[in-house]
Swiss-Prot record:
The name this protein goes by in its record: 3-phosphoshikimate 1-carboxyvinyltransferase 1
GO CC annotations on file: cytoplasm
Annotated gene: aroA1
Species for this entry: Streptomyces coelicolor (strain ATCC BAA-471 / A3(2) / M145)
GO biological process: amino acid biosynthetic process; aromatic amino acid family biosynthetic process; chorismate biosynthetic process
Annotated binding of 3-phosphoshikimate, by residue: 30-31, 35, 178-180, 207, 326, 353
Positions bound to phosphoenolpyruvate: 30, 104, 132, 180, 357, 398, 423
CDD domains per record: EPSP_synthase
The keyword Phosphoprotein appears for this protein: no
GO molecular-function terms, A-Z: 3-phosphoshikimate 1-carboxyvinyltransferase activity
Biological classification of the source: Bacteria, Bacillati, Actinomycetota, Actinomycetes, Kitasatosporales
Compartment(s) of residence: Cytoplasm
Length: 438
């Protein structure tokens, strides 16, 4: 967890002068967009993505697939329908070099794809990407027949020597540090000669909604997937080999990126509407309806979207966030402004995210006058009167939006490198000031 010295620009987080009352159109889901790109690239026919997220992580994924030979055409539909991407599969080829940035989905989902390429594919990325675990994917692919050079690091940079096909079959992995290890193998599994059987052997799996998302999206393009939820063995997922269909998919709004805007309603006692909130979804962000209601708000899901209203009071919460760890920074920010203590549990794996999020949240909230203690698997937060100061982001988009939430209630908060929000939420500063009517 280090402050990036190259990002010294400070953004004065707007202070709310009253209750917010806004409708915020949240861009598409990063998790859905990047899974859809991989599945479309592996399909047997062209497919369409409508309203995809255009952000650093998704553009890195699209460019990586283009580097491997996939054609992705970009356009804009009739008025009101938004952007679309047409994905035209092709034989995957090397040699190629893929820049993963610091995108977990790119660094983990694409090495399995690269095993199907005809030639070597080198993966590299931001300095922080070298510290993020990839051993689960690397070791599993070797068991399944792949040749990978990583100098024994279990991390980037690495080279996958694609042979045009991969045998596949059964493999055991410990995915307790990232559910993306499971998703990575499942997404490419239909293209392996024997499919794939992934058996998780470690402690509790984090972020299960993301695995459910992967399974749902695989089934939507014609894959046969057996899961623990569908009567299979515990902690075992099987994907049968077979062709994938090209689909026409409209990407849902990114519900995790709706978090700071919903938090604004809670913090200011106002109202925020998020259009097109799905009635059924596997996105972790859907848990916000329950969590933020428990913290003092109320919500109504209408045909138009989600209407979330703050009561003017913010309550502490004791909550297990193991399945929805990415929501932790925003919840911690709200909890620091509550009327009673909070305990956030089940998120030890956040130490391996874009930064060590538990250490970062503790340090930054405490430097504004807060009282946050790291626990073995989370945070204990005792609300205190906060004051202004610099809130460092550590190149982490969710740290930046958490700082913005604090700034609503605390004058003088300055966020270092708010531009890091472009990873998943382009134009966040404009959306934020627009919500406030600034």
């Amino acid at each position: 967890m280090t402050v990036n010295p190259t990002h010294t620009a400070l953004w004065p987080a707007p202070h709310a002068s009253g209750a917010v009352d806004a409708t915020v159109h949240v861009p598409g889901s990063k998790s859905v967009t990047n899974r859809a790109l991989v599945l479309a690239a592996l399909a047997s026919e062209p497919g369409w993505l409508r309203r995809p997220l255009r952000s650093r992580d998704t553009l890195l994924m699209a460019e990586a697939l283009r580097t491997l030979g996939v054609e992705i055409e970009e356009g804009v539909g009739p008025e009101g329908t938004g952007e679309f991407w047409r994905v035209i599969p092709a034989g995957l080829r090397g040699p190629a070099t893929v820049d993963v940035g610091n995108a977990g989905t790119v660094m983990r989902f694409l090495p399995p794809v690269a095993t199907l390429a005809d030639g070597a594919v080198r993966f590299d990325g931001d300095p922080r990407s070298y510290e993020r675990p990839l051993h689960g994917v690397i070791d599993a692919l070797r068991v399944l027949g792949a040749r990978i050079d990583d100098d024994g690091r279990g991390a980037l940079p690495l080279t996958v020597h694609g042979g045009g096909a991969l045998e596949g079959g059964p493999v055991e992995i410990d995915a307790s540090s990232s559910s993306q290890f499971v998703s990575a193998l499942l997404l490419s599994g239909p293209r392996f000669n024997q499919g794939v059987e992934v058996r998780h052997t470690g402690s509790a799996l984090p972020s299960m909604p993301h695995i459910r998302m992967t399974v749902d999206m695989l089934r939507a393009v014609g894959a046969q997937v057996d899961t623990p939820e569908s009567g299979g063995e515990p902690n075992v997922w099987r994907v049968t080999p077979g062709a994938l269909l090209g689909r026409d998919l409209t990407v849902e709004p990114d519900l995790s990126n709706a978090q700071p805007f919903l938090a604004a309603a809670l913090v200011t006692g106002g109202k925020v509407v998020i259009p097109d909130w799905p009635s059924r979804t596997t996105q972790p962000g859907d848990r916000l309806r329950e969590i933020f209601t428990d913290m003092g708000g109320s919500c109504e899901l209408t045909d138009f979207g989600l209407v979330f209203t703050g009561s003017g009071a913010i309550h502490g919460i004791d909550v297990d966030l193991s399945e929805v760890g990415e929501l932790t920074p925003g919840i911690a920010a709200v909890a620091a402004l509550a009327d009673s203590p909070s305990t956030l549990r089940g998120v030890a794996h956040l130490r391996l995210h874009e930064t060590d999020r538990l250490a970062a949240l503790t340090k930054e909230i405490n430097e504004l006058g807060g009282d946050v203690t790291e626990t073995a698997d989370g945070l204990h937060i005792r609300p205190r009167r906060l004051h202004g100061g610099v809130f460092h982001t550590y190149d982490d988009h969710r740290m930046a939006t958490a700082g913005a939430v604090l700034g609503l209630a605390v004058e003088g908060v300055q966020i270092e490198n708010v531009a890091t929000t472009a990873k998943t939420l382009p134009d966040f500063p404009d959306l934020w000031t627009g919500m406030l009517g600034a």
